[in-house]
C-alpha cells in the first residue's frame, strides 16, 4: 500500500493539485493507494465517489485541521504493516507527523520551490529543515528547486529530481474545438497563457508585448486562462493599452475548452519572474502545451529550463526585460518557427507522461 498525505488534491485546481492527483492515480497500477486530503469544498465528496482511490478527507478550521490530519495519519501508519511508502506533498504535511511512528516506513517529501524559499536560519527555514529530517528522500521538481534546497540547508544526499508528470493528450471534442476557434477567430498569432494571475507569471509584460506587437500583427489575439489576485490590475492595464479586442481573460472554463484553446494556439507564453520569495519551480503548463504540439516561451528565473528545451521546443527569455520577451515572440512567429518548435515539443513532452514518471517513483521507493 502507498499512503499519500496532501494539502493539495483534485477537484481543487492548480499545478500541485494536478501533480498529487496524477501521482496517486498512477500509483494505483502498482498497488492500493490511501489518500489523506484536506476537505475544502462540497465538490470534494462527489469527486471522490468517482475515483478508484481510497480518499479520506479531513475537515475543520485550517489552523486546527493540520493537527487533526497529522493525528489521523500517525494512527493509520501505526496500525498498518504493509505500507510501501508514505508520500507528502509539502513540508507542512510532514511537520507534525511523529518521527518514531513514520520511521517504520519509507518517507518521501516533495518540494516545489516557493514553499521552501525562506532565508537561511529564519524561523520558517528552521521548521523546514526539522521537518525534512524525518524524510528518507526529498523529491525536487526541477534542477532549480534542488539547488535552492541545497542553498537553504536541505541535505544534498537526500534530494532526488523527479519532474512532474502529465496525462497523455486527449482527443478534443468537436464542440470545444469549434468554441475555441470562435474565440480566436481569424487571428494571428494566437498566443495563450494558462496560469494564475500572479505577478511572477509575467502577465503585465505580456500585455505590454501584445501592445507592441499589434502594430506589426494587427490581427493578434492573446488569451489568458486563470484567476488570481492580479485580475483587476491586469484588466485595468488592458483597457489602458487599448487591447480590449485583442485580449480575452477567461476563468473557470471547462478543461476540454482549455485544452482546445491550447491546441489551436501558435504559442504558449509565460515569461516568469521572481516576485519576492515567489518563484516558478518548474512550470508544468509548458509541458502540457508541448504535448499538444505548442511551443513555449518561459522566463529564465526558476525551473522553466527543465520544461522547455531552449532553441528546440521553445525559448527561454528574461521575463523582466520587455525587449527580451518581444524579440523572443518575434523569433518564434517569424518564418513559422513555432511549427518546427511545436513538433519537437510534442516529442519532448512524452518523457513526462505519467506512466514513465511514476516508474521513477517506484524505482526510488525500491532503492530506499
Segments (PLM) and residue ranges:
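Carbohydrate-associated surface elements
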Residues: 144, 165
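A short, well-ordered alpha-helix in the C-terminal region of glycosyltransferases
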Residues: 189, 219, 337-351, 363
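Acidic donor-binding loop of glycosyltransferase active sites
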Residues: 263-278, 294
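Short His-centered aromatic/hydrophobic patch
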Residues: 88-94, 111
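N-terminal strand-loop element at the rim of the active site
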Residues: 6-13, 19-67
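Conserved donor-binding/catalytic core segment of Leloir-type glycosyltransferases
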Residues: 139, 183-201, 207-210
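Nucleotide-activated donor-binding/catalytic signature segment of Leloir-type glycosyltransferases, i.e.
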Residues: 225, 235-256
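Conserved acidic donor-binding segment of nucleotide-sugar-dependent glycosyltransferases
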Residues: 309-311, 315-322, 331-336
Amino acid at each position: 500500500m502507498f499512503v499519500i498525505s496532501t494539502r493539495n488534491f483534485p477537484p481543487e485546481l492548480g499545478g500541485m493539485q494536478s501533480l498529487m492527483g496524477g501521482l496517486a492515480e498512477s500509483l494505483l497500477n502498482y498497488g492500493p493507494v490511501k489518500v489523506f486530503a484536506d476537505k475544502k469544498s462540497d465538490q470534494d465528496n462527489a469527486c471522490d465517489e468517482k475515483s478508484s482511490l481510497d480518499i479520506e478527507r479531513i475537515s475543520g478550521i485550517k489552523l486546527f485541521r493540520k493537527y487533526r490530519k497529522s493525528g489521523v495519519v500517525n494512527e493509520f501508519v501505526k496500525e498498518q504493516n504493509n505500507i510501501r511508502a508514505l508520500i507528502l506533498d509539502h513540508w507542512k504535511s510532514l511537520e507534525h507527523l511523529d518521527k518514531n511512528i513514520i520511521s517504520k516506513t519509507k518517507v518521501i517529501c516533495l518540494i516545489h520551490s516557493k514553499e521552501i524559499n525562506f532565508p537561511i536560519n529564519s524561523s520558517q527555514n528552521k521548521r523546514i529543515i526539522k521537518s525534512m529530517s524525518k524524510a528518507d528522500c526529498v523529491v525536487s521538481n526541477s534542477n532549480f528547486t534542488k539547488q535552492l534546497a541545497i542553498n537553504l540547508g536541505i541535505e544534498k544526499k537526500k534530494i532526488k529530481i523527479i519532474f512532474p508528470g502529465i496525462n497523455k493528450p486527449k482527443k478534443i471534442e468537436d464542440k470545444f474545438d469549434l468554441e475555441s476557434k470562435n474565440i480566436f477567430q481569424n487571428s494571428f498569432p494566437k498566443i495563450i497563457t494558462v496560469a494564475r494571475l500572479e505577478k511572477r507569471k509575467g502577465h503585465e509584460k505580456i500585455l505590454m508585448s501584445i501592445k507592441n506587437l499589434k502594430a506589426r500583427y494587427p490581427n493578434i489575439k492573446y488569451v489568458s486562462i486563470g484567476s488570481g489576485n492580479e485580475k483587476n490590475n491586469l484588466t485595468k492595464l488592458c483597457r489602458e493599452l487599448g487591447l480590449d479586442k485583442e485580449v480575452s481573460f477567461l476563468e473557470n472554463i471547462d478543461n476540454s475548452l482549455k485544452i482546445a484553446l491550447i491546441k489551436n494556439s501558435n504559442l504558449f507564453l509565460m515569461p516568469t519572474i521572481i516576485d519576492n520569495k515567489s518563484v516558478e519551480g518548474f512550470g508544468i503548463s509548458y509541458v502540457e502545451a508541448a504535448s499538444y504540439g505548442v511551443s513555449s516561451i518561459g522566463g529564465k528565473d526558476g525551473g522553466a529550463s527543465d520544461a522547455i528545451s531552449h532553441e528546440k521546443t521553445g525559448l527561454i527569455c528574461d521575463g523582466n526585460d520587455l525587449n527580451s520577451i518581444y524579440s523572443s515572440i518575434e523569433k518564434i512567429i517569424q518564418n513559422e518557427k513555432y511549427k518546427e518548435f511545436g513538433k519537437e515539443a510534442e516529442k519532448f513532452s512524452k518523457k513526462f507522461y505519467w506512466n514513465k514518471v511514476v516508474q521513477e517513483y517506484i524505482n526510488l521507493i525500491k532503492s530506499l
